[in-house]
Amino acid sequence: SGKVVCVDKGEWDKGGSPEHIDLFNEEWIAECREHLTENGTIWISGTYHNIFSVANKLTQLGFKILNVITWAKTNPPPNISCRYFTYSTEFIIWARKCPKKPHYFNYDLMKLLNENKQMTDVWRLPAIARWEKSQGKHPTQKPLALLTRIILASTKPGAWILDPFAGSSTTGIAANLLGRRFLGIDKEKQYLE
């Protein structure tokens, strides 16, 4: 369509060696685990570059993986190289801290939001809207609709939500709109100002 599209996802997404990626994931997931309640859950999004390492580290650290959501973007960015299929999905792992402790899942609301049918693990939602992107410059910002669904599915009003990679704080905005408490962390100062 003649539009210029940025495909830079940020310095942190460039990875490094598999060993470096694994070590990084182990460290931050272990830190999050320490702060989760016994029946707490964690949601982690990523692309194929990182998500398999994340899944392995979650399992090694004692989490029980509940679902791997496939976020099928209804408006993916174009495939500029034309050498492979257009990349239109991201994966979101939902896991609970303790395999034997029950977690909260708002099954009825998820069913209601899905025309009274069980919600599947494939979520067809658009990528970030232009109006949302105007609120921040984070290259991997997630859409408000995605974070809203995650929060509604797995927390009760008043619950604490931690986002250790807060970026432009879409998670915080969704948490606030839904009556949850929020703590966001980001190592990049430009996103905290």
Regions found by a protein language model. Give the residues of each.
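Core catalytic lobe of class I
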Residues: S1-L192
